[in-house]
Amino acid sequence: MSPDIVWGTDIEVEEVRGIPFKVYPDRPRHIGDLLGYAARWADRAHIVQGTQVVSFTDLQRAVEAKARELADGGLGADDRVLILGWNSPEWIINFWACALIGAVPVLGNGWWSDSEVADAVETASVTVALADVRGSAKLPKVLPTARWACDVQDADEQVPAFVAGERASEDSPAVIVFTSGTSGRPKAVVLAHRSLLAGLQMLLHITRRLPHMVDENTGGAGLHTGPMFHIGGVQTLLRSIIVGDTLVMPVGSFKPDEALRLIEEWKVARWSAVPTMVSRVLEHPDAQTRDLTTLKSVTVGGAPIHAEFVDLLRKGLPGVEPRVATGYGLTENGGQGTAASGRDTVERPGSCGRPLPCVEVRFEGATDDVDGEVLLRSPTQMLYYYGEETSPITEDGWLHTGDLGRMDEDGYVYITGRAKDMIIRGGENIAPAAVEAALAKYPGVVESAVFGVPHPDLGEEVMAAVVVSDGSTADQLTEHMREHVSSFAVPTRWQVETSPLPTNHAGKIDKGAVAEAARARLMEESQ
């Protein structure tokens, strides 16, 4: 039996923490309540990884058993519990168990070093840790730990259901998610129940997947290749239990050949990933021999998608063309800002769509010729950075994103770069994203990273690290760029190769690492 929660589609303005937000009056209030939807899907497979297949019933029993175990160990409301591990059924069960007892899951990055784990434990004032084998080896010895393992298959049918205590308010902390740290030390973003549930409700609303809009035939297999410890992973967990999705997860880190095998074997219908992952799958030799016809929907985020990427999808996955989707968001706003799908991704390449129903967007400092900083205001935004006094949110509720962008006359948003990444060459501002978009138009370019490097007279010059598939040269790329960008934005330094660029734990190109290595090499060459 599903929880007695009313999900509405009407929107009104409500004062939240002294700020006027657009909200759904009829809404869920606590993420722990969502676990009850597992009963609707019963014996359907919910989590698939390797040889493990966990049904929705298995999940609910295992979560309640784990919640009882944690509560018996003294954990409860407001305790901050570090979950440190790679994607697995145990990760998901531990997350839901923390939510059920009112604890606050602190999502650790499975790729962190020992010192980064120690920093996170200190930053978020972690009470206890739940860690897999790899994660356990990185934990500070003084930190208390609880058992990672979960009794998935052995959960006893006769054990009474776990009875949760009084629910915290919707504006109390629900989860702590760390930023990627690409601009420095990762920040601990505290998201409320309202933050997560408002984002979930908006997505279910626009896709017509609210609980009362779906039937028992809804759902299907979805490939999940991103880390659960990012905001996108949390969104996937919440959505999948509402619509009855089967989460198909690779074992370990992302591998194109394994992704292809899983799509064929589990007849995957949906896949959410960053563009780099999708490109590498479609360019893998096995893509020509695997049956990918069941894949009907691809959602990409983490980087703009251009016409060339959509064309790659058309050729490699012709069945997904009407259902290519993208969007824009960041951890600090619960990952939910804008969305685009279908024809919009074809007719407006480079756009991340229009604002979601409860999201307001404005562009600070924008003029007719200059893009402005993107500011967002919505109920999805964070409460604060844990352990930090500064906040990117103004008194009237506007979140400074640090991204640059603009909106066209039809309300579609375009993200053109990061303010901090702007290359300033002889007084001219150059957005790396715009240069990368132009490079993507060249047929032989597989992927690229554009950044600034020091120049004695101009301050900076433009450098491009480019992966090509057809033996293209720097001279050919330069000629192409002269036709597509201003003369001052044409890269004057090139790194052309055939091996993939390094990626971070989210599967995105690690531009920081590429730029750092290039600058060090240039410095060495100049000596």
Give, region by region, the residue ranges found by the protein language model.
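Conserved AMP-binding/adenylate-forming
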Residues: R27, Q49-Q52, A67-W112, N429
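Conserved pre-ATP/AMP-binding loop-to-beta segment of ANL
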Residues: P160-F178, G184-R185, P211-A221
